[in-house]
From Swiss-Prot:
Keywords: Cytoplasm, Methyltransferase, RNA-binding, rRNA processing, S-adenosyl-L-methionine, Transferase. It is found in: Cytoplasm. GO terms for cellular component: cytosol. GO terms for molecular function: 16S rRNA (adenine(1518)-N(6)/adenine(1519)-N(6))-dimethyltransferase activity; RNA binding. The keyword Aminoacyl-tRNA synthetase does not apply. S-adenosyl-L-methionine binds at N18, L20, G45, E66, D91, N112. Pfam families: RrnaAD. Specifically dimethylates two adjacent adenosines (A1518 and A1519) in the loop of a conserved hairpin near the 3'-end of 16S rRNA in the 30S particle. May play a critical role in biogenesis of 30S subunits. This is Ribosomal RNA small subunit methyltransferase A.
Amino acid sequence: MRNDVHLGHKARKRFGQNFLNDPYIIDGIVSAINPKPGQNLVEIGPGLGAITEPVGREVDKFTVIELDRDLAERLRNHPDLADKLTIHEGDAMRFDFTQLVKPNNKLRIFGNLPYNISTPLMFHLFEFHKDIQDMHFMLQKEVVNRLAAGPGSKAYGRLTVMAQYYCKVVPVLEVPPTAFVPPPKVDSAVVRLVPYEELPCPAKDLRLLDRVCREGFNQRRKTVRNCYKSLLSAEVLEELGVNPSMRPENLTLQQFVAMANWLADNPQH
C-alpha cells in the first residue's frame, strides 16, 4: 500500500494532509484535551478521525469543520460518529466561530492543523478569544517553539507576541514524524492555548500593536531607535521604559503594547 494512502483515503498535498496513526500519541492528545459531556467541543480538520473517534467515545455531541468534501462525507456515514457530529463543510479560516457559542458554554477547539495554514488560522481564532475556553493544536514543532518563545530568542516574533497577548501558551507533547501517514519532513508538537479572561496588557488599537510588531521583527537586528525613528523619538522610548539601543527582538509584550498605546494616544505627533 502506498504510504500516502491511509484507510483508503489518499492524502492531498494541497490540503497539507498528514494523517495521525500512532495510538500512544493519539491517547496523549485526547488526555490533554480531556473532553467531557456537555462541553462545547469543536474539531478543526478531523481528517480520518484519529482524534475524532476517541473524543466521540467521551462525549455525546460535538462539532467538526472539514474542508475536504470526501472526508466530510465519510464522517456523515461513520457508524459511531454520524449521530454525534454537527459537520460544517468549509474553510476554518473563513468560519465565524461566534455561531457555535452557547450561553455559559465557551468553545473548546482542537485539531491536527494543516501546517500550511496554521499561523493565519491562529490569527483568525484570536479574533474570537472571548468565546474560547481553550485550544489544543498539533503544529509543526517550530511553530510551537515560536508560540512559547521568550524575548531575545531566535524563535521570538510577531506570532509569539500576538499569541501571548491573547493566551497562556503551554507546550504539551512532542510528536515524531513516524506518528503520521505519510510522515511529514518535520517534527510536530501539541500546544495548549488558554485565552485570558482579562487581557493582562490590553492594547488601545490592535492595528498599532500589529504595526509595531511587524516593523520591529522585520528589522530585528537594528536598534529600537533606528527601527522606530519615524514613529517614536528616543525620548519617548526612554519615557516608556524602552532602551533605544536595544534590539526589537528583545522587547517584551508589555513594551510593544506600551509603544502601541503611546501611538494611539498621540496620533498627530
